[in-house]
Amino acid sequence: MSDQDNNKLIIERKSKLALLREAGNPFVNNFKPENLAQDIIQKFDSSSKEALAQKNVQVSIAGRMMLKRVMGKASFVHVQDSSGQIQLFITRDELPENFYNEQFKKLDIGDIVGATGVLFKTSVGELSIRISDIKLLTKSLRPLPEKFHGLSDQETRYRQRYVDLIMNKTSRNTFKRRSQIVSYIRNFFNNHDFIEVETPMLQTIPGGAIAKSFETHHNALDMPMYLRIAPELYLKRLIVGGMDRVFEVSRNFRNEGLSTRHNPEFTMIEFYQAYATYHDLMNLTEKLFRGIAFDVYGSANIHYQGNDFDFSKPFECISVFDSILQYNPNLTATNLNQDNAKKIAEKLGIQVKENWGLGKIQIEIFEATVEEKLIQPTFITEYPTEVSPLARCNDDNPFITDRFELFIGGREIANGFSELNDAENQAERFKKQVEEKDASDDEAMQYDADYIRALEYGMPPTAGEGIGIDRLVMLFTNSPSIRDVLLFPHMRSEIGK
């Protein structure tokens, strides 16, 4: 539909609304639907015509008109509510005198109506409602996209999610499934004796991750504050305080780029368990993913973007170092040592900075050559200490940490490790991060003196993990982009377009 035609229809609908206003308030607020379309269909669709006629089932529903076929003295209307669609059959003789011609025929597709009637089946066997009363509840001023073309423009779907949800059943199901997944996650951790907590979203020091933060200003306190990039340091303060198992479903903010995997505002589940190791959390993570699969699909097997995953099987597990060698058969261990790793990275087009150590260079090689090849669920372990400022060093090799990341479908889904609870060691690592920030690394962490003070009281041996819920939902809804699983993803401003 052209903009000119669309504007013409809007003008026509506004004229109808003006006439309705003259007769009273057209936005009725006293209709109480007693039924949902899908419930009616599930309960009565198998009934015969004769059985329905004998039962004389009275129903009332409310929803949006999605289709309207006027055939003289009778009409068929499809009404859509939150559960689905059902057909209404409306005849002139069943309604008050003159109502059919003077009011019903003036209703438009997109209008929200309330209707009451009796169930019956049409000549072709479609369960329908024979309407005895229908009321306009809300007048739609903008026409919906054409039925057979729908809302096909991807950017418009993201910008006008409200229209996408009206027109696209797949989108509605995606967000219902997202809610189901988050509910399952909460129940999972509650059932494993974790306590759900809430920590500050406005922080004086952004910490818990290597990322750029959003800065704001607190007027009353006259001080800069930051939207959190992660809740980690606050959650570990709670471990110090004796809350041995905590989790938070958190909104995090990172002032970084947009992509099919990244949105500046995103949701995570972070959880921390005292007297546990990163191996314990790897086992717990497998159990969580298996449970989500069964809850969503009734099976451990799911399909995502051309790949099949069986969550009943143990996840693969390999170290950062070994994975680089496995996926780069032309390289040897010698290629990844202090003398040669920089040359390998530069051959790959990586711009190696002067302050990068061997660990950082190895991770850059890993991200460039391995990450996207990790299709089946895989734990990557033994991350270099240099890129893991909050993780516990490995007892046998201080160059690496007791850390893992989980990759599925070529992207990181989770990050966990045994926590560093040595206050002096953590202070030294913070100082190193400050040096890197002073050397123009915008993502390096700041020194958090209060967190060090908390560690000085003593934090028990602890393991913690963060799982990206948006990416998790992408996986379990077979969605190719993070924008498909965010109701209102961030977009460039329409102003000036």
UniProtKB/Swiss-Prot annotation:
TM segment ranges: none
Q: Where does Mg(2+) 2 bind?
A: 412
| GO CC term, one of those recorded | cytosol
Residues bound to Mg(2+) 1 are: 405, 412
Keywords in alphabetical order: Aminoacyl-tRNA synthetase, ATP-binding, Cytoplasm, Ligase, Magnesium, Metal-binding, Nucleotide-binding, Protein biosynthesis
Q: What is its EC number?
A: 6.1.1.6
Entry superkingdom:
Bacteria
Q: Which reaction does it catalyse?
A: tRNA(Lys) + L-lysine + ATP = L-lysyl-tRNA(Lys) + AMP + diphosphate
Q: Which cofactor(s) does the record list?
A: Mg(2+)
Q: Where is it chiefly localized?
A: cytoplasm
List, in alphabetical order, the GO biological process terms annotated in this UniProt record. lysyl-tRNA aminoacylation
Kindly give the Pfam families that the UniProt entry links to this protein.
tRNA-synt_2, tRNA_anti-codon
Please provide, alphabetically and separated by semicolons, the GO molecular function terms listed in this UniProt record. ATP binding; lysine-tRNA ligase activity; magnesium ion binding; tRNA binding
Instruction: Paste the cofactor note.
Output: Binds 3 Mg(2+) ions per subunit.
Where located? Cytoplasm
Query: HAMAP family from the xrefs?
Result: Lys_tRNA_synth_class2
Q: How does it assemble?
A: Homodimer.
Q: Which PANTHER family match?
A: LYSINE--TRNA LIGASE, CHLOROPLASTIC_MITOCHONDRIAL, LYSYL-TRNA SYNTHETASE
The UniProt similarity line reads: Belongs to the class-II aminoacyl-tRNA synthetase family.
Q: What name appears for this protein in its UniProt entry?
A: Lysine--tRNA ligase
Species of provenance:
Ruthia magnifica subsp. Calyptogena magnifica
Species classification:
Bacteria, Pseudomonadati, Pseudomonadota, Gammaproteobacteria, Candidatus Pseudothioglobaceae
- Gene symbol here is lysS
